[in-house]
C-alpha cells in the first residue's frame, strides 16, 4: 500500500504510539507481514484471535482494547480502515477515522470519517497537525 511505510516510520520517529487492529489471526498477520520488516515499528497488535477480545469488528471492542493497551483515549486515535466492518468498529469506538477507498462512505455510517484514496493524504495531515501544534 503506497505511503504505508512512510506513515509508519514517521509515527515511529515522532514517538506517536501505534497499534495494528485487525480481524486476521496472529498467524495470518505474521505470514502477510513477513516481507515488510518496517511493520515491526508498530509496537502493539490486536488480532482477531486475541484472547482478551470478546467481540470483533464491527463491534468497537478491538479499537477500545488497542487504545486501552496504549494508555490513550480512543477519541485521540486515528484509525485507517479499508473495510465497512472496520470503519464501523473504529467509529463506534470514537476514533477519528480515515477510510481508504476510491468511493465515499455510505450514508448509513455514523460519525464523520474522512475518505481518502491514499495514505499519503493521512501522512500530509499528520505532518501538518504535528508541526502546527
Locate predicted features.
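Short, acidic loop-to-helix structural element flanking the phosphoryl-transfer center
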Residues: 1-20, 26-30
Amino acid at each position: 500500500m503506497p505511503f504505508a511505510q512512510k506513515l509508519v516510520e514517521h509515527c515511529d520517529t515522532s514517538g506517536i504510539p501505534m497499534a495494528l487492529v485487525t480481524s486476521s489471526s496472529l498467524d495470518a498477520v505474521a505470514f502477510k507481514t513477513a516481507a515488510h520488516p518496517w511493520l515491526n515499528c508498530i509496537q502493539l497488535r490486536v488480532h482477531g484471535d486475541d484472547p482478551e477480545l470478546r467481540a470483533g469488528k464491527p463491534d468497537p471492542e478491538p479499537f477500545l482494547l488497542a487504545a486501552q493497551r496504549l494508555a490513550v483515549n480512543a477519541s485521540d486515535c486515528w484509525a485507517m480502515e479499508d473495510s465497512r466492518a472496520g470503519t464501523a468498529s473504529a467509529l463506534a469506538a470514537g476514533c477519528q477515522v480515515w477510510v481508504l477507498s476510491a468511493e465515499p462512505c455510505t450514508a448509513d455510517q455514523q460519525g464523520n470519517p474522512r475518505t481518502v484514496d491514499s495514505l499519503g493524504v493521512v501522512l500530509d495531515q499528520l505532518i501538518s497537525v504535528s508541526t502546527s501544534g
